[in-house]
Design a protein with these regions (language model features):
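Hydrophobic positions on the alpha1 helix immediately C-terminal to the Walker A/P-loop
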Residues: 34, 38
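Structural recognition of the conserved hydrophobic beta-strand(s) that form the central parallel beta-sheet
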Residues: 91, 116-122, 144
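Accessory nucleic acid-recognition modules appended to NTPase machines
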Residues: 201-372
Length: 445
């Protein structure tokens, strides 16, 4: 399956000032497969090592940080084949299980800069925090992976012609039915299936929703098992409680995350470490409030007032026990969660683009689902789950802060209008992957 992260790997390989690459991302989002495939296609030799269960591997790093010795022992002893600097890609998988291997990346950067070495881990954020691991600041390149984006999903499911065709259309042009009908269907399927590669592969192989759900159930169980595997029993219980509360909290009108809704009477102090664990693991995504939208938004964010989404919209749908037919056919009673799924979908697409969003809210409850300062510009994004695009909050925001460009994303077709100083675009949910194209057009980047 085609992943855009592959291009990032190629760019890393060809950099003149290349450093060891540290690939992070939620468990089962496709890191190991992609890195191995990259090695198979781009290198004469691949030396793969996995710290999760490969006996004796950690001891190679326990003695000292002599990189020549480490490479010699990894090659000659562990795998029984010499590692050649100019030809071999060295992969250190599940590196979070070996703190000294993470530290060794600094010395590989300094002593053997020509060696192609990729380290990957699913719980890197958790390990770095809980084990007090000294991170090799400035000595590694970073790549964060996510589940498959909508664009990647469509291409994997045989819809490349629709993606390619849409990319050729003028941005101002209303999208013809030739594209809208199949892409709306792909969008609904993406809400059901999500972007976890194993689930997507099951869907591609069978086009059976129940088969895909069986894979989703296994992943959800694996996540829950990780809570107890990598934390104390007390913390695992708290993480599980937060994990179970996320779909409930997302579905509320005011989807601000409230700790007392996790456990009656609970305070933030009691549960914030458990929340940090689930966010650092990549399983959940945290969206902070910005009340005063000034650039940089990161400096204006209130990390104590936030929403929590999941890193995969298909897993959210499955965990919330929403029948796939409800997504595909619709239901008059399916209202609040339908909007929550659309928001979670846009959040994931923005993250896949490398964009960090926030949300905006006033004391009078006017709210913008997402705002970002991508490219140094303030950009509000309002999300609607159907084709009703009335957006009072967006008009209020544009009138008050005068962003040069703003977006309404729904099932309504492409359209635009000028409101004061703001150019407001209607961008269909299934065409949101063109978000950056509209930015480039607006600002002539």
């Amino acid at each position: 399956m085609e992943r855009k992260a592959y291009q990032n790997l190629l760019k890393w390989k060809n950099k003149t000032n290349r450093k060891p690459l540290l690939v992070s991302g939620v468990r089962q989002c496709g890191k190991t497969y992609l890195i191995k495939e990259f090695g198979r296609l781009e290198f004469a030799d691949v030396a793969y090592f996995n710290f999760d269960g490969e006996e004796g591997l950690q001891s190679v790093f326990d003695y000292n940080f002599d990189t020549d010795r480490i490479i010699d022992e990894l090659g000659s002893v562990v795998r029984g084949k010499k590692i050649t600097v100019d030809e071999t890609l060295v992969i250190l998988d599940e590196i979070q299980a070996c703190p000294r291997a993470i530290q060794s990346l600094k010395y590989f950067c300094e002593n053997i800069p020509k060696l192609h070495i990729i380290a990957a881990g699913s719980l890197l954020g958790v390990a770095l925090k809980e084990k007090g691991i000294s991170f090799p600041v400035g000595k590694v390149n970073r790549l964060e992976m996510f589940p498959m984006s909508f664009e990647e999903f469509v291409i994997a499911d045989g819809g490349k012609k629709y993606i390619d065709g849409l990319n050729k259309l003028n941005l101002e042009r209303e999208i013809p039915e030739l594209y809208t009908m199949p892409l709306e269907k792909y969008y609904k399927n993406y809400l059901v299936i999500g972007g976890m590669p194993e689930v997507v592969q099951s869907w591609i192989d069978t086009h059976d929703y129940k088969e895909a759900e069986e894979v989703q159930d296994i992943i959800l169980k694996d996540y829950a098992d990780d809570f107890g595997k990598y934390t104390t029993p007390d913390t695992a219980i708290k993480i599980k409680m937060i994990w179970d509360s996320i779909p409930v909290q997302i579905a509320r009108d005011n989807s601000k995350f409230i700790f007392s809704h996790v456990k009656q009477g609970a305070r933030a102090k009691e549960l914030e470490d458990a929340l940090s664990w689930i966010v650092n693991s990549g399983i959940a995504l945290k969206l902070d409030l910005v009340s005063t939208p000034e650039i940089p938004l990161s400096g204006m964010a209130d990390s104590t007032y936030f929403k929590v989404y999941l890193s995969d919209v298909g897993l959210l749908r499955r965990k919330a026990n929403i029948n796939y037919r409800t997504i595909l056919v619709g239901n008059d009673a399916f209202i609040h969660f339908k909007g929550a799924l659309a928001e979670n979908y846009i959040f994931i697409q923005l993250k896949c683009m490398g964009i960090m969003p926030y949300f905006w809210r006033t004391k009078a409850d006017a709210e913008i689902d997402f705002i970002t300062d991508y490219g140094g510009e303030l950009i509000p994004i309002e999300v609607k789950s159907a084709d009703n695009t009335r957006a009072k909050s967006l008009h209020l925001f544009c009138g008050r802060y005068k962003p040069k460009i703003a977006f309404k994303s729904s099932l309504k077709n492409v359209g635009d209008n000028i409101e004061g100083d703001s150019h407001i675009w209607s961008l269909p949910l299934y065409a949101f992957f063109r978000f950056k194209d509209y930015m480039k057009r607006e600002f002539a980047w």
